[in-house]
């Protein structure tokens, strides 16, 4: 891949060791050196159709565990709505990854995924919530030479609007 999880692990390593971190993942990939990490992992239903633990359910439960930081390994479905709502209820300094072609596309992708959440929220409300929830987007990609690098860092300044803080051609 482009190195999203590797970068997420590197950024998380800079978090104060005294902070309580709750990680939510589909498959355990995050490796944090902190003492206060609670790892939650999704699982499919059994052959009998019971026991499923979704990312959405895990995000909701993580908030009850009083995290200083919530880290969602990858947002790829309707859990985007739960993550955005969590970020807008005082859970700041959270981290996650999402597949997108650039910072503006991150906002659009989160909109689409949040709409899948089925809360019946109008698009304008979702856009406003996303803009309020996100501070900075770091975009990584694999260059033409095959090397992974941070290609853009952007500040979210409004719904569907980012301000480039750094851009490097790949």
Located regions from the model:
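Conserved lysine of the Walker
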Residues: 4
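Walker A (P-loop) phosphate-binding loop of P-loop NTPases
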Residues: 1
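P-loop NTPase switch/communication element
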Residues: 9-60, 106-110
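Conserved P-loop NTPase nucleotide-binding/switch module
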Residues: 25, 30-35, 62-159
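C-terminal regions of RecA-like/P-loop NTPase motor modules
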Residues: 161-170
């Amino acid at each position: 891949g482009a190195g999203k999880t590797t970068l997420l692990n590197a950024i998380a390593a800079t978090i104060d060791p005294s902070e309580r971190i709750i990680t939510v993942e589909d498959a355990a990939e995050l490796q944090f050196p902190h003492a206060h990490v609670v790892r939650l992992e999704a699982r499919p239903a059994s052959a009998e159709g019971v026991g499923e633990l979704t990312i959405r359910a895990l995000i909701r439960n993580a908030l009850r565990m009083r995290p200083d930081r919530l880290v969602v390994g990858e947002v790829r479905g309707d859990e985007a709505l739960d993550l955005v709502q969590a970020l807008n209820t005082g859970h700041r300094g959270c981290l996650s990854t999402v597949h997108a072609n650039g910072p503006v596309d991150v906002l659009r992708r989160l909109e689409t995924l949040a709409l899948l959440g089925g809360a019946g929220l109008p698009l304008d409300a979702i856009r406003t919530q996303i803009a309020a929830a996100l501070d900075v987007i770091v975009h990584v990609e694999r260059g033409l030479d095959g090397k992974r690098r941070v290609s853009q860092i952007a500040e979210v300044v409004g719904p569907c609007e980012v301000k480039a803080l750094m851009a490097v051609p790949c």
